[in-house]
Amino acid sequence: MSRVVSRTVPGGACVVNKDDFLKSFNDVDKVSVSSLADAKSKFDQVIAILSKSQEDWNKRRTQLQIIRSIVINCEDVIGRDQLLGQLVRLADCLDLSVKDLRSQILREAAITCSFLFEKYGNDVHQIAERCLPTAFSQLAVSTKVMATSGATLTLFLVQYVQTKQIFTCLTTYSTSKDKNQRRQLCVLLEIVIEHWNDKLKKSILPQIMELIKSAISDADPETRAAGRKAFNKLDAIHSEEADKLFASVDANKQKMLRASDAASSSTSVNSERGSAPFRSKLSAGSVGGMRNVPNISSKFLAQRSASAIDTKQVTRMTTSVSRTPNTRPMTTRTLSKVDTSPGGSKFARPTVGTLGPRTTSNLRARGSVPTSQPGSRNGSPPRRPSTTGTLPMEMQRVKSNLGSSSFVSSLTPDQAESLQKAMNTAKESLGQPSRTEDDEFLLPKRKPKTPQKSAVDISRVEAVIRACVSTSANEKRDGIKMLSIIVSEPNLSQIELKNIGQVLNRLLGEATNPVVLESVASFVKAHHSRLSEWLKLGLGKMFAKKGSEMMPIMKKHIVTTINAILSSFDPALQLKATCELMCDPIHLLSPKARVALLEYLTDLLEKHMERGSPFNTKEVKATILKMFSWMSDQRNMQQIVPHGEKVLCGLFALNAADFSALFNDFNPDYREWAYRILQAHGHNQHAPAPESPSPVRDQQVRANISNTAAQIEDFVVARNFELSAEKSPTSRGMLTSGFKRTDAEPLRPLESDMNTQRMDDISINESFDRLKVRILETTGFYAAFKVDFQE
């Protein structure tokens, strides 16, 4: 096997790469299989041998080769589906072989797995998902054969097996302690960007961007370089996502990425110096085009760093010069004079000796036209007089900018002037000063194609968050000051809000800082509609802070912040969050923090919730039970009981119907306790005061009641008389004396009639009594007019 140095593990022999694997795929002995049963028996033998790590390593290597031979020679015999069913059984033994400590076994297993991945792709994803962590673990091995075998296996695996499980496994290595694993992850990200299908990439592109962002900030320089390559690949295929990623990093990273863009483009410049294709672009592929194109000499290219050359800019500059009309065509002798400088550019350059005296004098005359002359073609500002007298002013300016005498000598004054204008235009378009020796103006400017979603620079927010959690006191103080400015920005993204909320919660757990409390208040006022998830944890921190703070001044700041929360969030949402916090078994509150919570709940019920708001929910029920358990605690009873009683009174005053319905499900002890509390505190004080009765109205009500009672009594007496008349024998005889009833029923017994009359009288009297009681209750004078039901 040829030993080719892998690009992922630089230096040294005894390393393998992708070409070695491809050559070894078919380098196996032929194995014949006659049927599915025969193939199954052979696979059983393979599994039996490979599953024993103590088996002879030559036998295990042979069995790995047999797997490839069966796949190559026997797929037509037993069918693809049947073969795949047998191959999936090999997942465990192949993983064990990749994990082997002997390099020959590892290399052969990596070749076999890569062969299966290339041939079957996602159909063998079970094997790939099993072997990927093992292959990555081999990257940290110092033995180069083992490390490069594992690295090459990951290349085949990621390229041909495209599943979300594979990508999820890859993301775990972004925080690996081994730099080789992080570096290999960047290489695999290039493969994902280039080879995976767009439908699958669409859902994982944000994660790819985060991984690349992490890579370009890595501590290992080689990992950073691999991350920049992955960024360039992303830029080439998904430019919009690359622009978003570019905008999300800080200025130093942006400069590094722009330099990597220029370096990648200048690589083609360095490789194409003196080559025909690059010259053909500049000369338009014709001798006529070459006449007007100046020589980009090696001295000009050598004085610029490779990362500071933009091929597009050079092409634009030289093309603009080539379009300048020449007043006199060059002779054939001129074309024979070719520059053979080390740079290799072979553009024809005119010399004084080849043009003749007439041409030379014309050049001098044209170059010496005064700038104040009306007929001058020079549109540039007045220049100082030439001190050399040998070169025209345009050439001197170009020479001062480019520093190449061979280049300058090849230009006519018009060409030099046009080139100078092109250079000035390029500098101005890039926003750089006209006279500077800084090469940064040649770096390509990346313009995002889509506007940023947030007005705040993402890198600025991240930097402030990092400063707030820094161990340096000065940096942390500055970060907190900047945080107080950032929290009120209206265009923060949801992720930024989440990160800021976590930082504020962390700062609230430390020593009390008025700036932090003001930041929390501003944060809540500006973004309360999007902080429903933060509210519960934020309230817990505020209650703990209020309970532990001893200084009155700091307590005032805390109360101000809590009032901001009360006035900003929806009261129903606050009630739910407070109840969840109170019943949460994880967030245990100290006794003083419990008091702060009950005070907050009392203010919420009495001052911020509307009368009649429903609260008959399971959260409130659990909260009341929790509060009763707090009030029953003998150790903290004196602190908590008064505030718990206020909460109960507030609930009753808010909605008495829900309060009664809620307590119907409680045990009698709690109901009696609650009613005693309400009676002791006078629950009527929470309800609106009734109108004071006036004497005139009192007399009218009494008169109406008396009239109604008299009418009811008259009705009852008349009804009793009618019933008695109908049931008496005398009345019946009087009614029937004139004629004989043919349908008369036999007379009922007297005792039965008396019982019936008695029951009717009782029912009428009870109805009358209930009616009087109802009238008295509705008029509010039930206490003054008690009805004796025994009467």
UniProtKB/Swiss-Prot annotation:
GO MF annotation, one: microtubule binding
Localization, UniProt: Cytoplasm, Cytoskeleton; Cytoplasm, Cytoskeleton, Microtubule organizing center, Centrosome; Chromosome, Centromere, Kinetochore; Cytoplasm, Cytoskeleton, Spindle
Pfam families: CLASP_N
InterPro entries registered for this protein in UniProt: ARM-like (IPR011989), ARM-type_fold (IPR016024), CLASP_N_dom (IPR024395), TOG (IPR034085)
Annotated function: Probable microtubule plus-end tracking protein that promotes the stabilization of dynamic microtubules. Required for the formation of mitotic and meiotic spindles. Specifically promotes the polymerization of kinetochore-bound microtubules. Also required for cytoplasmic streaming.
Subunit record text: Interacts with hcp-1 and hcp-2.
Name of the protein in its database record: Protein CLASP-2
